[in-house]
Amino acid sequence: DKGIHIYTHGEMLPAHAYPKLKKYPHLKGNFGTAWQNQQKEFDNLPGAILYTTNCLMPVKPSYADRVFTTEVVSYPEMIHIGEDKDFTPVIEKALELGGYKENQVRTGINGGEYVVTGFGHGTVLGVADKLIDAVKAGDISHFFLVGGCDGARTGRNYYTEFVKQTPKDSIILTLACGKYRFNDLDLGEIDGLPRIMDM
């Protein structure tokens, strides 16, 4: 144990609900928002960055010295961790940089500090009776599946506005990076179930 805290980014957010991943005490949370915000969120980040998927923005010089890739992901001039999975360079860089000196508060794009995740099929099936009862009782009128990429540029906020306008007796199921446009909104609960369920 070297005291390194590990955070996911982007579409790795739902992984925090996976028992085989969340059993590791070094995994502390999710840093930042969607993949398209990497350049802003990784700028001057005092930690090592390991890309595991191809949602990769061009790497800026301000953090190029701390970027590593693995699996099918690669980027010119970045160190690639091969099949041997020797993460020594990543660990050494993390120790060298030391992380933030003080606790940081990060918000979603709407200012929210918390998101709930983990509503994969197993979890949803585990509360299916509760959902069915809520529908039969008239407490839930609609389910909306919002899957897609809203993007980060001004004016690309269709899903944000859509979700804000959904009836208070509806459930929003999320997929893909478009969720970052609204997953930090506090839309409340219905019968103890959050109105936003990140799948």
Sequence positions of predicted segments:
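Metallocofactor- and cofactor-centric catalytic cores in central/energy metabolism, strongly enriched
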Residues: 1-199
